[in-house]
Amino acid sequence: MVSLPRPAATDVAAQCFLNALLRETRDWQLLPGTSPQALAQIHYPLSDTQAIRIPLRYFSPTQHHHYQFPAYLVASDNDRQEAIDFARLVDLILAKPSVRGKLADDVLARFARRVRESHQHTWQAIELRHDWNTLRAQPLNFAEAEQALLVGHAFHPAPKSHEPFDKTEARRYLPDFAPRFPLRWFAVNKAHVAGESLALDLRTRLLRFAAQSAPALLAHFTDTRWLVPMHPWQAAYLLEQPWCQQLVERGDLTDLGEAGAHWLPTSSSRSLYSETNNDMVKFSLSVRLTNSVRTLSVKEVKRGMRLARLAQTSRWQALQARYPTMRVMQEDGWAGLRDAQGDIQEESLMALRVNLLFDTPDTQTNVLVSLAQAAPDGGDSLLASAVRRLSHRLNLPPEQAARCWVQAYCDRVLLPLF
C-alpha cells in the first residue's frame, strides 16, 4: 500500500494506533531527553536485542500522547538507529511474541490489513478536504461539527476501518469526506412495515418525512402502501437478501430509487441529517465501522421509545426545568420491514430522532469527540482553538478561559447527567 505524503513529523493516524498500544501494554518506558533540547522518547522493546523508539512532542497524563515521526528501530549492541515507516512499525509490533500470542497467521494478517487501511483512509480524508484551518478558525454549526471528526477514536488501532466500503462508497457515505446524498425509497405494503411513533402515528410520521424529504414521490404513498426511506447503500444490500427479493417478487415492495433532499452523514456514519426535515434518522448499516457491524436491534429501538416516554414524565420535566439548557435528541419513533413470514428484519431498521435544530440549523454546536481530536497538522485542536477565541473575546488569559470553558461544560452537560 502506497504511503501518502503528510506534514513532516506529524501522523495522527499512527498516533491513534500507538496510544491504543501504550494503553493496553505495560512493558514500554518513557525515556527523558538527553539534553534540554532533545525530545523524550517512548522505548518499546521488541526482544532482548531490538526496540522501537518514538520521539515525543508531548507526553500526556491522559495518555493522548503526541509523537514526532518517524519511529526508529534500535539495536542493543550498537548506537545505530533506523527510521521506519508506519507499515513496518505495525509489522514489527505484531511479530512480538507477547503481542502475537497464539493468534493464527490469518487473524494477524487481517488485523494488520485493517490497521493499514484505516491509516490510509484517515489521510485520504484529511488530504481531500484541506479545510482543517477553516474548521479551526470559527464556531461550527451542527452539520460542520458532525463532519469535523477526521481522525477518529483516539485509542483504537484502526479507527477508520470501514469494510466492505470501497473507495468510491467511502467518499460518498462517510462523514470524513463531508458528503451529502439523497435517500433511496421503498414503497411497501403496510402489512410489511413494522414500527412505532410517539407523538404521531407511524403512518403520519412517515408521510411527513416523505413530504419534507421527497415530495415528488408522494403519489406512491397510499393507505395501503407506505414510503419507507432507506440509506442508499443499505437499500442495495437489502435488495440482495432472499427475504427482500421475495417481497419484491410478491409485489409487496417496490424500489423507487434515490430521490429528494440531500442528507449528510453525521460522526457515527449511519445517522443522517437534513436541515429541512423534522427528523434525523439512524439506519442499520451492514458495514464494519471501526470494529463492529452497525446494525440496530429491535431491543435498541424500543429502548429509545422508553426513554422518549420517560421524557414526558413529571420527574423528567422537573429535571428539564432545573437544567433548561439541557436537551436530549429523543429517538421517539422507529420503522423496519417484515419478511413474508411477518418477522422483523433488523438489517432494515431505522430510528427516527427528533431534529432539535429544525428551526435553527446554524446554531453553534460542539461535538466533543471532534473538539478533542488531535489536529492533523500538529497544531491546536478544535477545543484549544475554541478556548483561544474565548480568551480573545473576554480578554482573559488562556488558562482562565480554559477554566471558564470547562466550568460551562460541567454546568451544561455533566451536572444534568450525573
PLM-predicted stretches and their roles:
Residues 1-415:
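Nucleotide/phosphate-binding site architecture used for ATP/NTP-dependent chemistry
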